[in-house]
C-alpha cells in the first residue's frame, strides 16, 4: 500500500480531512515501532474479536458484552440509547449503573428509517425477561428522537413500568454523545416520568 492510499483511508474516518490524515500518517511513519505497528496489530485483533452483543447491541469482545454480564449492575434499570457512542458517553462518566439497549438510530420519515431498521423488537421481551422496573429514554432531543421516544413509550405502556426521559442539560436539537459528563450527569439525575 502506498502512503497516499493510507492517507485516503484515514480521510474516510469521521472528523478527519486530508490535512489531518496526512499529519497522522506522517506521525505514524515516524513512530513505527512505538505507535504504528502496535496500532495496526490492535486494529487487526479487534476486527476479528469484536462482536455485537445479542442482548443490548453494544460492541465488545465478550458475548454477552461486559456490561450485560456484570452482575453488579442493576438489570432492572434499562437505558435505551440511540447509538453506541451514547452508551460510551454514559460509561465514560461512570454515572449510570444499569444496563443499556442500543437502537442503532432513530425513526425518521425523512430518511425512510422505520421500526424494522432499528433494534426495537426485543425491548418488550427483554423488559419481561429481566423484570425491568424502569426504562430510561436516553435519546437525543431531536425531532426524530422525540418520535422514537413516543414510539417506545407506546410499546411499553401496557407493561405498567416506569418510563422516564432524560431532562435538564440536553438542549433542544442536542445529541447525547456531544455532551460533557457534568451535563449528562445532571440530565440523568433530573429525568422525569413520561409514562
Curated annotation (Swiss-Prot):
The gene is recR. Signal peptide: none annotated. May play a role in DNA repair. It seems to be involved in an RecBC-independent recombinational process of DNA repair. It may act with RecF and RecO. Belongs to the RecR family. One of its GO terms (molecular function) is zinc ion binding. SUPFAM superfamilies: Recombination protein RecR. A zinc finger (C4-type) spans 53-68. The lineage of its organism: Bacteria, Pseudomonadati, Pseudomonadota, Alphaproteobacteria, Rickettsiales. Residues 76-171 form the Toprim domain. Coiled coil: none annotated. It holds the Pfam family Toprim_4. Keywords: DNA damage, DNA recombination, DNA repair, Metal-binding, Zinc, Zinc-finger. One of its GO terms (biological process) is DNA recombination. This is Recombination protein RecR. Gene3D superfamilies: 3.40.1360.10, 6.10.250.240, RecR Domain 1 (1.10.8.420).
